[in-house]
Regions:
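Transmembrane helix-loop junctions in multi-pass membrane proteins
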Residues: 18-31, 102, 114, 172-188, ...
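Extracellular/periplasmic helix-exit of transmembrane alpha-helices
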Residues: 298-314, 369-453, 489, 534-539
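Membrane-interface "cap" regions at the ends of multi-pass membrane proteins
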Residues: 1-14, 47-102, 284, 324, ...
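Extracellular loop-to-transmembrane helix junctions
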Residues: 31-50, 54, 108-138, 148, ...
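Flexible loop linkers connecting adjacent transmembrane helices
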Residues: 54-81, 107, 117, 121, ...
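Membrane-interface loop-to-helix entry segments
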Residues: 35-42, 47, 53-60, 166, ...
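Membrane-interface helix-loop-helix modules in multi-pass membrane proteins
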Residues: 22-28, 33, 79-142, 153-157, ...
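Loop-to-transmembrane helix boundary motifs in multi-pass membrane proteins
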Residues: 154-172, 366-373, 444-446, 465-475, ...
């Protein structure tokens, strides 16, 4: 195609995207078709990748396809493996796409679809994809080192240790929140619990099958795995209806917490080939297939967005989460726009599989755009269901039905209708019956809400194939595998971080080949995130109300730290005139996270500030005037949880400010130098047989 044809295509895409965005923005008081959001998003992603992504690659970073990558230099068939770019894109996407893009947009829908949509699109183009791409580039130029090691190398040992401690603490919070979403989705859900539990022996069987029974037969084991997944969902319905079997899979939140802690420990110490690898394989199939199916379903059904563009809760008084649109919308959406967790994947893991530096934009920038598209579809799925149902599902039980309420559903319908979102008890009963659950009231965490939206889209787009309950539990399985994959991998990664830290005290604890050291570090990791998980599960306000803001703040602060590193590297490369590419999102993230952190810690508003909330409940205990919706032990739990969250938030704020000072100091020192001071691996040209090596690796995959 000649240049004029290409220009015509990009011009047409720009016009279509601008028209779609304009239609969405100018539509006031009328319900619009969800297809407008999907079209606008796709146009934005394509234009951003073609122009901004490639500008960063060619002009800002000076990506060099002739430069040897760590995967080619150290090709050992284990950690360093040059991988075909399409295969690596799948690996990278599976690793970064966890619960964030699924849950964050669902929670953000409390304020309407418009604010969330704008930030998801603007945030990913200017911040999220930029971070993923630049960190991948920086790590690739330094032999695939991890984020903490990169900070240590470029900013000094003190900053490096501080970054490592912060990374570990943030990882613990992330894992606790991820696990809590699974717990909230599976509590008193025999169908969902059975289906997810079924995947554990299935994954182990697949691992043994491919390693010992039929080595190399990937096709066979894939068919077996997919067939058994469908059987797990169908048989889950039989289990849920059985008075004998249902109680075996009907657990409280606390029981599921301890089950997940035990599972997390076992999964982290078992050989990777036995459980994690086959589960990841199953998860990748399910992720990609479901995302594609959901996108096609939206195109076929063209559902109407029933949630308003802006709700009354933009003033910060919402029941799902508290706080004003700025800064709390930005930390609530989290991974759908920008995620610090991705920096841990883009450094240390993906760089060791990158076959050519020229593919970093496709993997890093493109992979994050794909995750953002998942977030857009999650937002659509949440906004097509009745707003009354949305708020009944996501509001805390203490708000919907105070302690002692006999008819919880009637109470919830009355409370939600009082907010201006009319809903009847019959409607809530009907939806619970259609999805095969005992109740949908206060199923906080976002995952059940997303599952309801997905179920109706998939059921409708396939012409009523299977009933809604099948698709609801299919969506729950999809979300649980999405999340448990991240919990498995995250626990293992956190164990490596902790062993690095423990190695400072005792060098023997750093050895990953030592079984006692591995078991000790793994136990400490699962107990750490298990503790926060338990605190969230027993929280009378649902846990998500307090833990998700902490997760959002910590995760976005980690992104800010990663982008600070990228800005420092640009200064040390003598490319400071382009440092704005990293400094622009860094500045916004620091403003948002520090503002949110300060408000969550010290705001006198008893719906926002952790300490204010703790003091309010402590005063109730001291005076003996305990509201009917709480018990004294519940109030004591809330006091402790909020004080702990405040302490952690203050710690993360101090860390990010200190690292910002180290960044400024390092950048100023770099400006005084006449030559580049970035500590890159010396240049080596790509070998002549690089393509052959990659092709061999592709066949091995």
């Amino acid at each position: 195609m000649n240049n004029s044809g290409k220009y015509l295509i990009w011009t047409l895409l720009s016009v279509i995207g601008a028209f779609a965005l304009g239609y969405i923005a100018l539509n006031r008081g009328e319900q619009i078709n969800a297809l407008w959001i999907v079209v606008a998003a796709v146009c934005v992603y394509l234009i951003a990748y073609r122009f901004y992504g490639l500008y960063i690659a060619k002009t800002v970073l000076g990506v060099d396809p002739t430069r040897m990558t760590p995967a080619v230099r150290h090709n050992d068939g284990l950690d360093y493996v040059p991988t075909d770019k399409k295969v690596l894109f799948g690996h990278h996407f599976a690793a970064i796409a966890g619960a964030g893009p699924l849950v964050g947009p669902v929670l953000a829908a409390q304020m309407g679809y418009l604010p969330g949509m704008i930030w998801i699109l603007a945030g990913v183009v200017l911040a999220g994809a930029v971070q993923d791409f630049m960190v991948l580039f920086v790590s690739t130029r330094r032999d695939g080192r991890s984020l903490g090691e990169l900070v240590k190398e470029e900013m000094g040992p003190t900053a490096g240790v501080l970054a490592l401690v912060a990374c570990f603490m943030i990882m613990v919070i992330i894992l606790a929140v991820l696990a809590m979403i699974v717990v909230k989705a599976l509590t008193h859900s025999p169908w969902g619990t059975y289906t997810v539990a079924f995947t554990i022996p299935l994954a182990i069987f697949m691992g043994i099958y491919i390693r010992y029974l039929r080595p190399g037969r990937i096709g066979e084991v894939s068919v077996i795995g997919l067939v058994m997944l469908v059987f797990a969902i169908i048989s889950g319905g039989w289990v849920a209806e059985s008075p004998t079997w249902a109680p075996w899979f009907d657990y409280t939140g606390v029981q599921l917490t301890w089950i997940l802690v035990g599972y997390g420990f076992v999964a982290a110490v078992l050989p990777v080939w036995l459980l994690l690898a086959p589960r990841d394989y199953l998860s990748t199939f399910l992720k990609i297939g479901t995302i594609v199916g959901l996108a096609i379903g939206i195109l076929i059904m063209r559902p109407t967005l029933t949630m308003p563009a802006l709700t009354k809760f933009v003033d910060g008084t919402g029941p799902v989460w508290s706080g004003n649109l700025f800064p709390f919308l930005f930390i609530t959406i989290a991974c759908g726009a920008v995620s610090g967790f991705h920096a841990l994947i883009s450094s240390g893991t993906t760089p060791k599989m990158l076959a050519n530096e020229g593919q970093a934009c496709f993997i890093g920038y493109g992979g994050m755009l794909m995750e953002s598209f998942v977030a857009i579809m999650a937002l659509v799925a949440a906004c097509i269901i009745d707003p009354g149902v949305y708020f009944a599902m996501n509001s805390p039980m203490a708000v919907l039905a105070p302690a002692g309420t006999t008819d919880v559903v009637a109470s919830a319908a009355q409370v939600v209708s009082g907010w201006g979102f009319s809903i009847t008890p019959d409607t809530l009963h009907q939806i619970a019956s259609e999805v095969g659950e005992q109740s949908i009231i206060s199923r906080a965490g976002g995952a059940p809400t997303l599952a309801v939206g997905m179920a109706y889209i998939l059921h409708g787009s396939l012409g009523g194939l299977m009933d809604v309950s099948f698709w609801y539990h299919f969506a729950i399985l999809f979300e649980a595998l999405f999340i448990l994959t991240a919990v498995d991998a995250g626990t293992r990664a956190a164990r490596f971080m902790l062993q690095d830290l423990l190695g400072v005290i005792s060098p023997g604890l750093k050895k990953t080949s030592s079984l006692p050291a591995n078991l000790l570090a793994t136990a400490l990791c699962v107990l750490a995130w298990g503790y926060f998980l338990h605190q969230g599960v027993v929280d009378p306000l649902g846990g998500i109300n307090t833990l998700w803001p902490l997760f959002g703040i910590a995760n976005q602060m980690l992104a800010g730290m990663a982008l600070m590193l990228c800005a420092v590297v640009l200064f040390k490369m003598k490319r400071q005139r382009y440092a704005w590419v990293a400094l622009l999102p860094t500045s916004w993230l620091l403003i948002c996270t520090l503002t949110a952190g300060w408000q969550k810690s010290f705001s006198p508003d008893t719906k926002v500030g952790f300490l204010a909330i703790a003091n309010k409940f402590q005063a109730m205990i001291d005076s003996g005037s305990i509201p009917p919706q709480y018990t004294e032990s519940q109030l004591a739990q809330l006091v402790f949880n909020n004080r702990l969250d405040a302490g952690l938030t203050i710690f993360f704020m101090i860390v990010v400010v200190v690292l910002a000072l180290f960044s400024i100091k390092t950048a100023l020192a770099a400006l005084k130098e006449d030559k580049p001071t970035a500590k890159e691996t010396p240049y080596q040209a790509m070998p002549a047989d690089a393509q052959t090596i990659t092709a061999q690796a592709k066949r091995a995959h």
